[in-house]
Amino acid sequence: TTTAANSFLFMNNCLLHENYAPTAWGTAIHAGNGYVCMNNVTVLGTTATGGNSITVNGDAYFMLANTTIVGNSGNPNGVFRAGGRASTVVNSLFAKGAGSRTIYAGNITSGGYNVYQAADAGWGAVSTDTDYSSQTLPAATLTDGVYQWTVTGTIDEFATKQAVIDAVKSFDATVGQQFINWVGENGFGVDQRGVARNVNKMQAGAYDAGL
């Protein structure tokens, strides 16, 4: 939980697994203020019971790149909500898992190439994003510490490493570049396991099969 305007949370190659919260709002991450930047992060299997629960939630500035949120139940307001400050998502996977909702429409800009299920209408999708609601994804389990899934023909838009980096830069001129420097540009060209991606055809989320 973060509440200070000058707080920064940078995450790279991280797994948040089976978080549980008995009350409302952020089940895995709750950021009321500040900046939250994520690359190659998997959030899997979180459970909540509060009526306003959301897996990753807050009014902070969020930047999600190459990130997977999947298999989350008891979060009636979805798996991701950026309710206050301008936030960006790029090349990320938002799967409903045992829940019924993923992206909560808020102050979100899409950097493109996201794959999502059961998102709110008007959340900010662009032409390179894919609504995957008609497809069945694998059960929410971990293999080699990451959620693995297979791309189908429904998806015909794929990010390049440079497109992801450009989206991170566009998020915030200062903080975006700081995050890139902290991760290193090469960190956007591998998946959460450290396995090289095809930098010209990257799979959405923290896992990449090497398309």
Walk through the language-model features, giving the residues of each.
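Predominantly extracellular beta-rich ligand-binding scaffolds that present long acidic/polar faces
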Residues: 1-181, 189, 193, 198-201, ...
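Short coil/loop residues immediately preceding or within conserved phosphate-binding loops
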Residues: 184
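Short, structured beta-strand segments at or near domain termini in extracellular proteins/domains
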Residues: 204-205
